[in-house]
């Protein structure tokens, strides 16, 4: 009876949070059945998934020293990943440099990544010529895993203390593709910013969007690929200072029907929405989310145009309460923001329509809470992130949430094997689309192979 009461309560909560429209996943049965067609017509039959999907992320830079030049190592680890009980890989094939680890006619190949190796930050070079993504697809399928390609989306270069790499450095004529931020020194193109890190692209730039859609079309045509996941599909920063390119100003003027009365819209140093934002500021924040929404919709259409059976999704941080700072609204269009979110009381009517969850086949929520914050009902607890995610998505798309087991508070030095069974159980019991773990490099670094196998085995025994 208590279980029934809990389920009814959860359903009532969803109904009050979301507009009362009929919902339904675009998830196709064959994606779970292991039958041919689950990831394209050329995908061999894969074992049926028992329980909910279990994804492990494979970051390009963090794993580059292992896989960039060794297809045999890829095959060996795919077997180990499957033996742990994972069902899916998300293989990063476009690191933050914007260069790619798959065959492309428009993007340069990734020949080096900056990474920590044996305690030193250095370049790891790729001299091998085998197709990196194809090697993962072949080895993953042979091990019984589904293989999804992850790409860092709105990026085009990486600036580090040991040098620079990426498209924006190789093509100075594309500087106008770069983000422009409202920094202390004034409006600054990302290529003129001294800070290290990714060089972000301008999401409002039509040339940037066309380039990325072409890239996604190439990726969707990859033989045997099961899915595509966009990462960093957002604006440059978390501080409301991004988006002030000439292309964005022109597009914003079109959106308003007039020239903006102030540019930049937000004052320097504004990191959160003001307590009483102006009409222009409300429209600007809505416009940025609309830009991302419209790109995600176009990306989904491009992927499914090339191959209707390739799943399309996005990774986002689960901390939605201030995710407007990145220009992203990952909720469903049906979600009632003003009613349910205390930090979104300022939104105009059009903001709700910028939610892009309805465009997706699956979505990944980064539940990156610390080791002492597994349980709870609020943000910055793993369980709370997942529960709130379910409310915000309104049942329109299956979601997988998961922890960062190497960088989140308390996980940095490993030795957290004892927590993994509880984390696995909590994520899989709370998320309708499974769980994901970030990242494979941390499983290797802290020797969590056996601990994850035990944790997933315990979950499977409950089915």
Question: Model-derived features: where do they sit?
Answer:
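Catalytic domains of carbohydrate-active enzymes, especially glycoside hydrolases
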Residues: 72-99, 222-226, 352-365, 426-435
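Active-site-adjacent "subsite" loops/lids of carbohydrate-active enzymes
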Residues: 46-68, 148-222, 274-281
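Substrate-binding cleft/loops of secretory-pathway carbohydrate-active enzymes
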Residues: 156-159, 163, 238, 306, ...
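Glycine-rich, aromatic-flanked loop segments that form ligand/cofactor-binding clefts
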Residues: 86-97, 132-191, 229-232, 308-313
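Aromatic-lined carbohydrate-binding/catalytic grooves of carbohydrate-active enzymes
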Residues: 86-128
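Aromatic- and acidic-residue-enriched segments that line the glycan-binding/catalytic groove
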Residues: 101-114, 155-194, 232-272, 325-337
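Substrate-binding cleft of secreted/luminal carbohydrate-active enzymes
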Residues: 346-463
């Amino acid at each position: 009876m208590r279980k029934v009461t809990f389920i009814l309560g959860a359903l009532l909560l969803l109904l009050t949070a979301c507009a009362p429209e009929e919902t339904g996943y675009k998830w196709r049965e064959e994606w779970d059945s292991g039958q041919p067609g689950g990831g394209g017509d050329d995908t061999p039959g894969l074992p049926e998934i028992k329980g909910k999907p279990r994804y492990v992320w494979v970051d390009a830079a963090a794993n580059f020293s292992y896989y960039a030049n060794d297809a045999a190592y890829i095959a060996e680890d795919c077997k180990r990943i499957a033996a742990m009980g994972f069902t899916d890989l998300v293989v990063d094939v476009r690191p933050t440099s914007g260069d790619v680890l798959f065959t492309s006619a428009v993007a340069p190949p990734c020949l080096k990544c900056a990474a920590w190796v044996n305690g030193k930050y250095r370049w790891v070079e790729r001299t091998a010529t085998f197709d990196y993504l194809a090697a993962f697809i072949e080895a993953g399928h042979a091990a019984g895993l589904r293989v999804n390609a992850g790409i860092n989306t709105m990026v085009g270069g990486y600036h580090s203390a040991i040098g620079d790499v990426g498209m924006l450095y190789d093509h100075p004529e594309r500087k106008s593709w770069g983000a422009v931020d409202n920094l202390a020194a004034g409006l600054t193109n990302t290529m003129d910013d001294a800070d290290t890190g990714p060089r972000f692209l301008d999401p409002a730039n039509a040339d940037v969007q066309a380039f990325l859609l072409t890239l996604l079309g190439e990726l969707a045509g990859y033989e045997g690929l099961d899915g595509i996941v966009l990462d960093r599909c957002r604006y440059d920063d978390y501080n409301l200072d991004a988006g002030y390119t000439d292309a964005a100003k022109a597009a914003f003027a079109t959106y308003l029907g007039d020239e903006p009365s102030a540019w930049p819209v937000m004052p320097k140093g504004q990191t959160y929405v003001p307590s009483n934002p102006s009409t222009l500021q409300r429209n600007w924040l809505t416009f940025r989310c609309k830009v991302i929404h419209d790109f995600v919709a176009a990306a989904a259409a491009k992927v499914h145009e090339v191959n209707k059976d390739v799943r399309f999704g996005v990774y986002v941080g689960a901390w939605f309460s201030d995710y407007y700072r990145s220009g992203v609204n990952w909720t469903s269009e049906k979600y009632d923001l003003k009613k349910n979110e205390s930090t979104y009381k300022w939104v105009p009517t059009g903001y709700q329509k910028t939610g892009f969850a309805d465009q997706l086949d699956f979505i990944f929520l980064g539940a990156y809470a610390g080791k002492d914050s597994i349980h709870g009902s609020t943000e910055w607890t793993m369980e709370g992130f997942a529960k709130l995610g379910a409310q915000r998505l309104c049942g329109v798309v299956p979601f997988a949430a998961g922890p960062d087991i190497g960088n989140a508070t308390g996980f940095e030095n490993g030795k957290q094997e004892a927590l993994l069974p509880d984390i696995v159980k909590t994520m899989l019991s709370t998320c309708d689309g499974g769980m994901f773990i970030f990242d494979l490099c941390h499983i290797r670094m802290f020797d969590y192979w056996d601990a994850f196998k035990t944790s997933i085995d315990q979950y499977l025994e409950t089915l």
